[in-house]
């Protein structure tokens, strides 16, 4: 773009002799570059746009909460955990809703295919209505389960269709004792590997609780180690505990085992607080009640620090 000079064109002056003398205007009053002016204007618009964007981001952060989905196996071997959840759910809600701003809770229960059970999955969408959640837990029956594998893949598919908020953090706590079916064994051809990858892309973190007697909760995360977000190598036919380890590790969650059935309550609260960034606050509140550290909560806190470090190294926010 060429430079444009603006000059004053002064009128001609008369000499005493009557002839005209044109006043030279060889000193430009102002020189400016049109491209430069346009660039500055565009820059101003960009800065203004960035300022609006930053304000919107701050506004979103101020209202950011947690979408927590409890996903549980209710087949026969898991009935004791369902009983605990029925009995302790009000306590869980009281703690979490006081601790975590803008919290919503959803529930997905699953059984198995073709085993005469009353359902394959039952879904309660994310809500703040505690009475509705409690009614869902009390009103959903246990089942029996058919083969060794359970309909985990169907529950994961339901999680993909959950009414997630665009603003909130997305967290799943999956508790069970059996792996999903492979694609060929699922009547609906649900592929748990691809569904898990899709959930990860939707920024859903899957924390797992492997429910088996005598399980060392500290070792669960080491049973199948994989980088966060690494879906380059397909997994299949993993053992039950290895599956629960893999799906947590690959989505940036925590895998933990249960030593005693009652531990499930502390673990659910700990996982939710961890994903909401409220683990320290929960620890303080629990210490007031128990007067001693809760081992599962201490472990979750330690694992959360390691995962955050990994995420930073991998470039995840």
Predicted segment positions?
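Divalent cation-coordinating acidic motifs and surrounding scaffolds
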Residues: 2-317
């Amino acid at each position: 773009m060429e430079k444009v000079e603006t000059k004053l064109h002064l009128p001609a002056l008369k000499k005493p002799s009557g002839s005209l003398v044109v006043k030279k205007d060889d000193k430009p009053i102002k020189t400016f570059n049109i491209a430069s002016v346009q660039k500055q204007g565009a820059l101003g618009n960009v800065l203004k746009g960035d300022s609006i964007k930053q304000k919107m981001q701050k506004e979103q952060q101020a209202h950011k909460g947690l979408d927590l989905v409890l996903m549980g196996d209710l087949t026969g071997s898991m009935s004791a955990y369902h009983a605990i959840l029925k009995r302790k759910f009000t306590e869980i809600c009281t703690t979490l809703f006081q601790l975590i701003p803008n919290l919503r809770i959803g529930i997905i229960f699953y059984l198995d295919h073709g085993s005469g059970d009353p359902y394959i999955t039952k879904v309660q969408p994310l809500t703040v209505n505690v009475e509705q959640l409690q009614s869902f837990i009390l009103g959903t029956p246990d089942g029996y389960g058919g083969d060794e594998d359970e309909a985990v893949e169907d529950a994961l598919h339901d999680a993909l269709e959950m009414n997630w908020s665009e603003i909130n953090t997305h967290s799943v706590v999956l508790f069970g004792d059996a792996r999903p079916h492979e694609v060929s064994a699922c009547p609906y051809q649900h592929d748990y590997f691809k569904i898990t990858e899709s959930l990860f892309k939707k920024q859903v973190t899957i924390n797992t609780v492997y429910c088996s007697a005598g399980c060392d909760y500290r070792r669960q995360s080491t049973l199948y180690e994989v980088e966060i977000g690494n879906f380059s190598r397909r997994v299949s036919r993993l053992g039950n505990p290895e599956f629960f380890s893999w799906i947590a590790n690959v989505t940036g969650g925590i895998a933990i085992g249960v030593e005693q059935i009652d531990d499930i309550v502390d673990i659910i609260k700990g996982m939710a607080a961890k994903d909401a960034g409220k683990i320290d606050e929960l620890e303080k509140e629990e210490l007031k009640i128990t007067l001693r550290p809760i081992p599962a909560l201490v472990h979750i806190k330690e694992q959360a620090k390691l995962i955050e470090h990994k995420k930073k190294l991998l470039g995840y926010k």
